[in-house]
């Protein structure tokens, strides 16, 4: 995935930031959001 500079404690928190970044499938890894490009 593509790491973005968004802190998180759970993957659901990454859904919107990833969509806002034009990507999908956010996951929380190492307390940062990681997104999958479209």
From Swiss-Prot:
Disulfide bonds: 8-28, 14-33, 18-35
Localization (cell): Secreted
PROSITE patterns listed in its UniProt record: SCORP_SHORT_TOXIN
Keyword Flavoprotein: no
Pfam families, per the entry: Toxin_2 (PF00451)
Keywords: Disulfide bond, Ion channel impairing toxin, Neurotoxin, Potassium channel impairing toxin, Secreted, Toxin
Organism superkingdom: Eukaryota
Region (Interaction with Ca(2+)-activated K(+) channels): 26-33
Gene Ontology terms, MF aspect: ion channel inhibitor activity; potassium channel regulator activity; toxin activity
Expression sites by tissue: Expressed by the venom gland.
Presence of keyword Cell division: no
GO CC list: extracellular region
Function as written in the Swiss-Prot or TrEMBL entry: Potent inhibitor of shaker potassium channels as well as the mammalian homologs of shaker.
Family: Belongs to the short scorpion toxin superfamily. Potassium channel inhibitor family. Alpha-KTx 03 subfamily.
Domain comment, as recorded: Has the structural arrangement of an alpha-helix connected to antiparallel beta-sheets by disulfide bonds (CS-alpha/beta).
Protein's name in the database: Potassium channel toxin alpha-KTx 3.3
Organism: Leiurus hebraeus
Classification lineage: Eukaryota, Metazoa, Ecdysozoa, Arthropoda, Chelicerata
